Amino acid sequence: MDPAFVDLVNRFGFQLLSLTLDPDKSTGICATNIYHCLSMVAAGSKDENLAAFSQALGFDVDALNETLQRTVKVDTYCKTNSAVEFSAASSIWHRKDFILEKAWLERMQMTFHATIGPLELQPINDFIFRETKGKFKNLIQSGDLAGTVLMLITCLYFKAKWQNPFDKMRTVRKSDFHTFNGKILPCAMMSKVDRMEYVEDELMQACFLPYQSEGNGPQWKAAVILPKQDGIDAMRGIMTKFSERPELLTKLLTGSGPNTPSSSGPPTGQTSMATSRTQKINLSLPRFSLQLHLDLKPALVNLGLGPTFKPSDDFAPISTGPLMISRVTHDLFLEVNEGGTEMAAVTVVAMSRSVQLNPVMRVDRPFLFLVFDAVTGLVLCEAVVNTLGRP
């Protein structure tokens, strides 16, 4: 994959993650999944909306086609490790009376291999359930479709086993985990003493746990990064560092780059990162399982996508007439235990008209007919019409 595009997606991910940080709960995203979904919408935008996507997603307006191709290549690359379960899927769901532009629809099918279907609960939820291996059941509710004319949904699933699993017999069933706000939560603490990649600098400690791997594709690992200082500000500082200088993150994760902070780098506290070295580490890591639901609109507006949440004709490549993004949500399942890691993600972009489409009511089957007083509510006549008599 193009290293510049990797940095771009990583920058977007840590910017977004930082904006969702909450002292009272966990947060988490699958940045590639969100980027994928927003890229599909960006492909149907123009003028001010396209400029907003360019700013938020970090691509050149003139390089939109190249960005779409790079987005798809990420999914293709990630599938090439046969020891890991990985899948990614795109979909478009629209009201039957909402006409999509043929060119955009064909582009979505050709580039993203998107599933196309009616905006109905059952097929949408079946798609999500299938593509996330059952991790999200009935994710979309009937209220989510109210006023919606178009919904773009991307799903991603990942499951991998540790190359060197944790011994369940060494897991301490009753241990403590200290949250940002000072609460102490009970946890099951896994532990191992083993040789592994490890790095430490003035901001953090980090270790890297490899997953089982086959083939010449991605070599998946988990990074566990622990701020040196307690509190949410220390965590935010690390994420800011990753988003402002994603090339440093890439060096940290790939093991390239200098072993010591660069003398020509940024000021103290923002130095380059040391390269990891393999050494014996005594690691204690809590077993955890997260199921998160995020409303991404505030964060995306902060990143520059504000214009896309207002009705305009700048989505004309998708459909003629005013159109706007009404909602962007992200759901994440993440479980880490002695055996490995399982993750599933769903991003939903819901779109609506600035003026709601007129409801269609075709009375061509039995109906109830009332004559009533609108002041008192008195019903003068009520009838079930099942035959019509004389026309």
Positions of PLM-derived features:
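Beta-strand-rich assembly/attachment modules of structural machines
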Residues: 52, 59-62, 67
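Flexible propeptides and autoinhibitory/regulatory segments associated with cysteine proteases
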Residues: 1-52, 355-356
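Extracytoplasmic/secreted cell-surface and envelope-processing proteins
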Residues: 49-53, 148, 232-234, 292-294, ...
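C-terminal soluble interaction/assembly domains
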Residues: 332, 338-391
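Short, cationic low-complexity segments
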Residues: 240-262, 356-361
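Non-catalytic, conformational "gating/processing" segments within enzyme and secreted inhibitor domains
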Residues: 24, 64-237, 256-355
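Short loop/turn microsegments at loop-to-beta-strand junctions
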Residues: 25-27, 207, 366-368
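Hydrophobic/aromatic-rich, well-ordered segments within soluble, folded domains that form packed cores
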Residues: 28-46, 147-161, 378
